[in-house]
Design a protein with these regions (language model features):
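Alpha-helical transmembrane segments and adjacent TM-loop junctions that form the membrane-embedded core
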Residues: 1-113
Length: 113
């Protein structure tokens, strides 16, 4: 009965789009935090899709970074997460510039003033 209950609970979590366990989300935060330049990870959403995991997040980095540099950081983060969670993991990273005084800083605007 205990084994059947465990299977039912696990499957219900998948069917109801439940987040992955806290220790798994901590692993994700640790992996992302190891990437140089990451200021903050927020809006982390995780779930299981069949035998794969889905990881969506917002990451704050230096706003003066080029698109090429941001893409390189995303590639490193995605590779590290796939090493941990498997090659079929769905990973979506949304980059945002670091906020100062509650607002996004625009480095180009500041340079031209």
């Amino acid at each position: 009965i205990k084994a059947a209950y465990s299977l039912i609970v696990q499957n219900m979590k998948e069917l109801t789009d439940a987040s992955l366990p806290e220790n798994i989300e901590k692993d994700i935060k640790d992996i992302v935090g190891m990437e140089q330049g990451v200021s903050e990870l927020h809006n982390l959403r995780t779930r299981r899709i069949g035998n794969a995991v889905s990881i969506e997040m917002h990451v704050r980095m230096d706003g003066s970074m080029s698109l090429y540099e941001a893409h390189a950081h995303a590639t490193v983060i995605e590779h590290s997460l796939r090493e941990r969670f498997g090659g079929n993991a769905y990973i979506n990273i949304h980059f945002e510039p670091i906020k100062k005084n509650g607002k996004y800083e625009n480095p180009k605007k500041e340079r031209h003033q």
